[in-house]
């Protein structure tokens, strides 16, 4: 792996893994959807972008809204993906927005801050005295890899390259 690959988050499949058809890769990515995970993978056509698929946190879905509201999540995160069958790769562009919870019935409001490219975010919250021995106890953890990790794993197991995009088009 070269320096540029490290900067972009590009990952290649293990040697000997046969590449699968684009339809199979897309179906495998969509197969990650489950009511038990805090993210959703959907068709990217509705975004008006060149993405084939978009993965994002389920911030506004009623079943997950309480969780995200309780943790006062301050960022929301999306991964735009385009499948490139002729190269056997999934090109991925991250997008992160700062958000605020507003109103009596809290709702999400996007702020003016956002990031595009390859985003790595880790947030943790602890409470003091929460552990059995009076030590600090982690009460909340958010890691952008909790969303990207499963996506990358499916792509690599399908024999395709995960190519991170820093700027420009997918």
Regions found by a protein language model. Name each.
Residues 1-170:
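A composition-biased, non-transmembrane "mature-region" signal
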